[in-house]
């Protein structure tokens, strides 16, 4: 049997977060999905969901004017030795894969906190990272 494990890969403002370009802006994202894929030698997919208006029979059967579209795209693992650099490259690749979907369906992207580095308090972020380094050298 085959299994799919969905992981919410959200922003990661810790010093372990990986900077990646999302829609032309820098964001800090979680390394977890790429790290797990690498560690277990499993494929990684970028998955997006957006709404689409329904009409006719589809609308009647759904009992809703809206339908959900789920798109899954494989994100090939980068070549080279395993380790942090490969996790960083793989993470940036899945963010790049999701970027166009988010741009195309921005109204369906619900983020309730700042995502982009430009929107963060940089002094607070630096203090947080310094604290992490002191606690976990």
What is each model feature region?
Residues 1-137:
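Non-catalytic C-terminal accessory region of glycerolipid acyltransferases
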